[in-house]
């Protein structure tokens, strides 16, 4: 099956003149809750953080100066725009139904046609994930056609930094090969439009030997790279010699000399380690990096090997030995690159070397000798100041600019670094690196808050804590200490907006750190609560009374607990089922609301959160969905609730009512009225009249306008938040494209 993935049709081409009768019929049949006007156009931008997620692969185009691409594990793919010095996102057109395609397993370029780019898209292989697809573009990613595959991909699974699995025949661009995790090798002969499995491919690619043990059990890794040997063929004809690498410690490298019909093991190859990358020099020599595991979670051993097909010889050129201190601090080799202008110039990266740190090694003699680069480097953090606290790690790919030998790129778990002066480094200078990440936003925000005073936005972010965003378009440092690892929940007092709480996790937690923090100045400074509740594992959800005098915290794996002195003493909240979501009324200090997804029941407290009683319900809608409660900012006793396929609900005057027209409610937020004296604007990520999208209503949910468009859907949208001070502005979190904000055009 093939579908087109393109932006919206220009408005001038949507229709010609409509007969008056048909217009009348349409006006009668239009659902009353839909706005009669056209959808409201919005301008969308990322809140500037800079990186924040694992960039898993890089590619320069070999014949087009300034053209490069990057892939990520959960945030889609990007193209570098040399004129603006920014990365351009290519996959924002995917909506919630296709959010699984935001994880890019592999990317491939046609070396003879700079306009063609291919993506293997699919994030997970678990039972609930959808199948993957191959996306192909003839306009550098401005639009894609999609070929659905009959199997799943793992762009955010073990081995995601290996590659590339997807390859274009350099002599005949119609031919592509794709190495899969558990389904062997697949081939296309029509620029990726149709695919078939290659028969006779080595069975080890589908075996248990090509799996690896992760934190949640075994995962298939399979074929991790496919490489055509361009010198074995000629333009216009299929390349006969092809290499394929399998992630196994057994025989792992295979070659075909007849265009992929027959395969045999390459003789003399090393065993006992898994290959992750294979790169060809202009002299026909190949270089392979190895680890005992595919990464990125772990890699404890590894090597770098040189293979010369002309003589059939293999040479171990590993730049640095393993530690011999017996401390279990071994490391692997994550990537290797060859300078396209000089086959003797190599770069290779360590992987998971935490003592003393990961490094990149450089050779100018084909691997006979090496110099560590990062140990003699300076890093410019000005583009994203928060990166100063993060050393390079998970260096799973390296690329050398084919037009500029001074520039190399390497990926990390939080973005892309670029060098300025590699040739000067060879002459004794310190290497200079800058964070080449503008436009590439890959954080996974877990909660957002737009207060009525102070900074326009505060965030809680996975892996990197969170930020006070005083200027949405300028990167900044994370929150001042104490620091969290995952920021997971953030809330403020409705009538004391500068009083803010946040909760999260702390990695390694060596000093029994308290995982709840309070700020009295809108997030500028923070202090820890006095203690945690006697049960739970931190994180969870926090809410604070309208007057700021009582806080309810529901840590992970615990019930709800209330404190009146920021953790000096805790009391267990009564009357709530496990897992209920809680929010404080924004006006009445004694009132709290709780919503339980398992039963669909709403609970209300009128005694300051000490106890709750059931007040209504809509029926069960699934414990897989996290409902939201949004009390109205200036009216006591009124709140909105999201209930998945049960729709959008409003609690008012002691009654729970389902708002008409909203078929599915994923997330919502409240913002400033669009008109002076009007009702708060509701922003909704959900389904209205059969169409998923981002909507707004300034009529208490009676009418809705869609405000996203077909080119800007950002995969999964969550934690929708209106701005209480700026009419029309909305913020939301994504599943890997950072924080997005929009304003009416």
Where is each model-derived feature located?
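N-terminal secretory signal peptides that target proteins for export/translocation
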Residues: 1-17
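Extracellular glycan-interacting surfaces
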Residues: 18, 36-745
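The N-terminal extracellular segments of secreted preproproteins, especially immediately downstream
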Residues: 4-5, 28, 604
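Local alpha-helix boundary/kink/capping signal
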Residues: 10, 14, 25-26, 143, ...
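Bacterial N-terminal signal peptides
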Residues: 21-31
């Amino acid at each position: 099956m093939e579908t087109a993935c393109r932006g919206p049709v220009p408005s001038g081409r949507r229709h010609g003149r409509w007969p008056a009768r048909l217009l009348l019929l349409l006006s009668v049949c239009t659902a009353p809750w839909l706005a009669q006007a056209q959808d409201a156009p919005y301008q969308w931008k990322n809140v500037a953080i800079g990186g924040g997620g694992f960039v898993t692969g890089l590619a320069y185009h070999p014949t087009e100066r300034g053209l490069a691409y990057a892939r990520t594990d959960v945030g889609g793919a990007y193209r570098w725009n040399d004129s603006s010095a920014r990365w351009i996102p290519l996959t924002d057109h995917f909506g919630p139904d296709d959010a699984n395609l935001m994880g890019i397993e592999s990317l491939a370029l046609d070396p003879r046609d700079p306009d063609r780019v291919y993506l293997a898209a699919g994030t997970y292989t678990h039972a609930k994930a959808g199948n993957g697809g191959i996306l192909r573009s003839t306009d550098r990613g401005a639009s894609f056609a999609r070929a659905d595959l009959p199997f799943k991909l793992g762009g955010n699974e073990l081995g995601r930094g290996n590659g590339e699995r997807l390859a274009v025949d350099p002599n005949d661009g119609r031919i592509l090969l794709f190495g899969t995790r558990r389904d062997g090798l697949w081939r296309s002969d029509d620029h990726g439009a149709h695919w078939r499995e290659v028969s006779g491919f080595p069975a080890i690619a589908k075996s248990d030997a090509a799996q690896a043990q992760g934190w949640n059990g075994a995962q298939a890794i399979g074929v991790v790279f496919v490489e055509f040997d361009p010198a074995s063929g000629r333009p216009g004809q299929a390349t006969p010699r092809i290499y394929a690498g399998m992630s196994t410690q057994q025989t792992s490298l295979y070659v075909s000399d007849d265009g992929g019909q027959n395969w045999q093991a390459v003789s003399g190859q090393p065993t006992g380690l898994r290959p992750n990358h294979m790169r060809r020099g202009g002299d026909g020599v190949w270089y392979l990096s190895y680890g005992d595991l595919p990464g990125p979670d772990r890699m404890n051993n590894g090597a770098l090997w040189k293979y010369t097909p002309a003589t059939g010889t293999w040479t171990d050129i590993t730049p640095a030995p393993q530690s011999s201190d017996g401390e279990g601090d071994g490391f692997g080799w994550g990537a290797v690159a060859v300078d396209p202008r000089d086959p003797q110039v190599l770069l290779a990266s360590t992987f998971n070397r935490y003592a003393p740190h990961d490094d990149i090694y450089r050779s100018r003699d084909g691997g006979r000798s090496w110099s560590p680069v990062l140990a003699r480097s300076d890093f410019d953090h000005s583009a994203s100041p928060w990166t100063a606290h993060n050393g390079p790690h998970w260096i799973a790919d390296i690329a050398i600019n084919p037009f500029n030998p001074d520039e190399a790129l390497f990926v990390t778990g939080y973005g892309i670094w670029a060098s300025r002066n590699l040739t000067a480094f060879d002459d004794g200078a310190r290497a200079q690196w800058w964070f080449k990440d503008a436009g590439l936003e890959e954080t996974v925000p877990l909660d957002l808050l737009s207060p009525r005073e102070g900074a326009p936005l505060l965030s809680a972010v996975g892996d990197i804590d969170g930020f006070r965003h005083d200027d949405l378009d300028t990167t900044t440092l994370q929150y001042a200490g104490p620091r969290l690892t995952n920021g997971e929940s953030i809330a403020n007092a409705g009538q004391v907006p500068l009083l803010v709480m946040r909760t999260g996790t702390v990695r390694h937690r060596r000093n029994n750190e308290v995982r709840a923090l309070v700020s009295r100045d809108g997030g500028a400074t923070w202090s820890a609560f006095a203690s945690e509740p006697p049960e739970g594992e931190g994180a969870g959800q926090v809410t604070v009374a309208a007057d700021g005098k009582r806080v309810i915290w529901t840590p992970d794996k615990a019930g709800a607990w209330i404190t009146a002195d920021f953790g000096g003493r805790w009391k267990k909240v009564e009357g709530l089922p496990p897992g209920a979501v809680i929010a404080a009324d924004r006006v009445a200090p004694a009132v709290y609301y709780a919503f339980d997804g398992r039963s669909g029941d709403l609970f209300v407290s009128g005694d300051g959160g000490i106890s709750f009683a059931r007040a209504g319900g809509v029926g069960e809608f699934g414990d897989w969905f996290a409902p939201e409660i949004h009390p109205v900012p200036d009216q006591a006793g009124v709140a909105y609730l999201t209930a998945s396929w049960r729709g959008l609900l409003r609690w008012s005057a002691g009654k729970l009512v389902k708002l008409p027209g909203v078929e599915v409610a994923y997330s919502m937020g409240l913002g400033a009225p669009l008109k002076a004296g009007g009702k708060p604007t509701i922003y909704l990520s959900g389904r209205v009249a059969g169409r998923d999208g981002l909507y707004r209503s300034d009529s208490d949910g009676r009418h809705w306008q869609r405000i996203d468009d077909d080119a800007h859907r950002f995969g999964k949208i969550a934690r929708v938040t209106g701005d209480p001070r700026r009419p029309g502005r909305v913020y939301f979190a994504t599943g890997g494209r950072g924080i997005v904000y929009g304003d009416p055009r």
